[in-house]
Regions:
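Short coil/turn connectors at secondary-structure junctions
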Residues: 1-2, 29-32, 60-61, 103-106, ...
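N-terminal phosphate/diphosphate-binding loop that engages ATP/GTP or pyrophosphate donors
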Residues: 3, 17-88, 92, 97-100
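Conserved catalytic-core segment of NTP-binding enzymes
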Residues: 12, 22-23, 112-192, 196-197
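Beta-strand->loop->alpha-helix junctions that form or flank phosphate-binding loops
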Residues: 37-40, 64-69, 168-171, 187, ...
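Short, charged/polar "capping" segments at the starts of alpha-helices
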Residues: 43-44, 175-180, 205-206
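Switch II (G3) loop of P-loop NTPases
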Residues: 94-121
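C-terminal binding/interaction regions
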Residues: 182-223
Length: 224
């Protein structure tokens, strides 16, 4: 079962956009895809990120599977537990649900909640969830001033845990002083891990799928 764990240097850097891009591109290639965001906080009426990636995969019901973790306060699960805002996250049923959907599909895409070391429980982080699932990472970072340290720190955390990183993807939106040079620096410092630049422009699943093609991500993942 091919799959990816889409994580990041932090929150609000473009993971959902990238997951939508991957899901729609794979669907256009006639693959069945389970695109899941098993943990999502900041949920008011519906889990917007989970809904968006499930729709992009053509499986909208994946946003409402049992054992998904949802919370209104936009905090890490362990923070919510400490505050008494949510029951502790139980990893085993979450992992079982993700694994089941993965076995039912040709591709499994799991979008993390926030960055690589977001605490899910007292002892487990997103990195631990990725390790249990056995999925290679796609590390998403925002192409802006300051991302060098953020990305190198996140990558060091992943590598120290023995996690495979398939690619680093720099999400480019508004012009920024660090944009452009970040790619050059990270490509050299993180070699042989590929570093790709994804233009985050049009909010449309098919346009995002096209960009995943243009930036070389699909060729990298599929060996095209």
């Amino acid at each position: 079962m091919p799959g990816l764990f889409i994580t990041a240097t932090g929150t609000a850097v473009g993971k959902t956009w990238l997951t939508r891009a991957l899901a729609r591109n794979l669907v256009r290639r006639h693959h069945t895809v389970a695109a899941l965001k098993p943990i999502e906080t900041g949920v008011v009426s519906e889990a917007l990120d989970a809904v968006a990636i499930a729709r992009a995969s053509g499986q909208p019901e994946d946003a409402e599977l049992p054992s998904l973790y949802r919370s209104a306060p936009a905090l890490a699960p362990w923070s919510l537990t400490l505050r008494g805002d949510h029951d502790p996250l139980i990893m085993d049923p979450l992992v079982a649900m993700i694994s089941t959907r993965g076995r039912e599909s040709e591709w499994l895409l799991v979008e993390a909640a926030g960055g690589i070391l977001v605490p899910l429980t007292e002892r487990a982080t997103n990195a631990d969830l990725a390790a249990v699932l056995g999925l290679p990472l796609v590390m998403v970072a925002k192409d802006e001033l300051g991302t060098l340290s953020h990305t190198l720190t996140a990558m060091e955390s992943a590598q120290r845990r023995g996690l495979e990183v398939a690619a680093v993807v720099l999400m480019q939106s508004a012009p920024d002083a660090g944009a452009g040079s970040n790619h050059d620096v990270l490509s050299r410092m993180l070699a042989p891990t590929p570093v790709l630049a994804f233009r985050q422009t049009e909010d449309d699943d098919d346009a995002l799928a096209d960009e995943a093609e243009r930036c070389g991500l699909m060729a990298l993942l599929l060996g095209d």
